[in-house]
Amino acid sequence: MKNMDEERKYGLYSLIIGLLCVIGIVMLNGLICYVLYIIAVPSLLYGIGAFIIPKTRRKDAGKLPFRGY
């Protein structure tokens, strides 16, 4: 995990949270199931997307490019 960039690291954390929520959805029922569903879907989407989307090639990935940069 030392050489992972921050976006992939947070994606991994989010993926773990999403998978734990899916396990909770399977095991539990009632209102807590809906709460876990609300947490699981965005977590899984972000976690999967962090690994599928290729890394940016710009050196300052967080900055928006503009004229004169």
Swiss-Prot record:
Bilayer-spanning residue ranges: 15-35, 36-56
Principal localisation: membrane
Topology in membrane: Multi-pass membrane protein
Compartments where located: Cell membrane
UniProtKB keywords: Cell membrane, Membrane, Transmembrane, Transmembrane helix
CC annotations in GO: plasma membrane
Highest rank taxon of the organism: Archaea
Designated name of the protein: Uncharacterized protein MJ0521
Organism encoding this protein: Methanocaldococcus jannaschii (strain ATCC 43067 / DSM 2661 / JAL-1 / JCM 10045 / NBRC 100440)
